[in-house]
């Protein structure tokens, strides 16, 4: 399927160029964010960490109907989906760091999905061996919009393993994106910079 094709493209590029195999990441918006979740669960041996912007938890959308339902009001129980994602990892199971962005004004992907994605990965990473501290929430601002950052950190090291940015007033658009693009909001925190900083701290 598509995840296999994308993992294969990574292999082709790595075979042609000097790619650090320990620093390959996947991030996306909307359906692309849902695909990043799938890649993190099915190819944890390829992707070191993932970024999920306005997406859905693992297997929240298995057909058109479930996709529309999840987008409108949230997906299935995150614990259940987290266990399914862990099972999908198979012999390659490991802790996958995840950074999530979601807007409170998103009418395409309901805001509840952001917290569900984070909760799903907390469950998946816990099953993979992580011991996470209780969630810690801190307020912030960026680009003119405020946000709440919820962090789930390694209990021993304090290293953030799952982060969720809930951006106030952000619609279905890439947070901090260019004015030249579509589905972007330059008056919001710079998701690209934040994701890259998170990725840089989490090689495989």
Residue ranges and their predicted role:
Residues 26-28, 53, 101:
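Short beta-strand immediately N-terminal to the catalytic nucleophile in serine-hydrolase-like folds
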Residues 58-159, 166-172:
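The feature captures the conserved acid-bearing segment of alpha/beta-hydrolase catalytic domains
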Residues 104-109, 175-187:
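Active-site rim elements
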Residues 184-204:
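Catalytic active-site module of serine/aspartate enzymes centered on a nucleophile-bearing elbow/loop
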Residues 1-34, 41-47, 93:
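Gly/Ser-rich "nucleophile elbow"/oxyanion-hole loop immediately N-terminal to the catalytic nucleophile
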Residues 46-57:
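A conserved short beta-strand
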Residues 1-4, 30, 41, 108-112, ...:
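Soluble non-cytosolic domains of exported or imported proteins
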């Amino acid at each position: 399927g598509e995840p296999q094709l994308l993992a294969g493209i990574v292999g082709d590029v790595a075979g042609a160029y000097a790619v650090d195999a320990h620093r390959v990441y996947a991030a996306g918006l909307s359906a692309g964010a849902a695909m990043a979740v799938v890649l993190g669960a099915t190819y944890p041996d390829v992707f070191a960490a993932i970024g999920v912007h306005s997406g859905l938890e693992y297997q929240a959308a298995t057909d058109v109907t479930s996709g529309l339902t999840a987008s409108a009001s949230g997906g299935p129980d995150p614990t259940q989906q987290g266990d399914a994602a862990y099972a999908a990892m198979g012999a390659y199971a490991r802790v996958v760091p995840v950074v999530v962005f979601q807007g409170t004004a998103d009418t395409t992907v309901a805001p509840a999905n952001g917290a569900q994605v984070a909760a799903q990965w907390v469950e998946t990473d816990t099953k993979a061996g992580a011991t996470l501290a209780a969630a810690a929430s801190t307020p912030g601002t960026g680009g003119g919009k405020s946000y709440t950052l919820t962090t789930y950190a390694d209990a021993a090291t304090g290293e953030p393993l799952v982060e969720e940015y809930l951006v106030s007033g952000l619609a279905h658009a890439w947070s901090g994106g260019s004015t030249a693009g579509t589905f972007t909001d330059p008056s919001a925190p710079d998701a690209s910079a934040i994701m890259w900083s998170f990725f840089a701290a989490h090689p495989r």
